[in-house]
């Protein structure tokens, strides 16, 4: 399972770089400044949590238990729901997608709590 978090974290970080480049070079002038800022927010949170997945992989390799693994799954879910809904909101101009974005944010928060608790227990 350790490899899973390293691989998924690295892939999501790479996709975050690609999304950031797309936002900077492909969306500027095509969407409103507010929507461009929304896209940047999605990229930022994706990158932070992709890097967090690498930390989860490292902690799991050090013997992290189910709480650490749960944190990793929450980070993946958070990226898919939080960043994914914001990307789709910007690209499709479908505003109702903003209603599910907080669910991804909640997954991030739960993930950080699980990660802290799991690392504390393993110390």
Annotate the PLM regions.
Residues 1-123:
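Polytopic transmembrane helical bundles with strong interfacial aromatic enrichment
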């Amino acid at each position: 399972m350790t490899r899973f978090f390293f691989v998924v974290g690295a892939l999501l970080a790479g996709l975050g770089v690609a999304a950031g480049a797309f936002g900077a070079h492909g969306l500027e002038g095509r969407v409103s400044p507010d929507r461009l800022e929304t896209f940047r927010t999605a990229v930022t949170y994706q990158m932070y949590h992709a890097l967090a997945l690498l930390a989860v992989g490292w902690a799991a390799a050090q013997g992290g238990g189910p709480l650490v693994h749960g944190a990793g799954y929450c980070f993946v879910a958070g990226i898919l729901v939080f960043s994914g809904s914001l990307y789709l909101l910007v690209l499709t101009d479908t505003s109702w997608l903003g209603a599910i974005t907080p669910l991804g944010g909640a997954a991030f928060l739960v993930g950080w709590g699980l990660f802290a608790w799991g690392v504390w227990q393993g110390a």
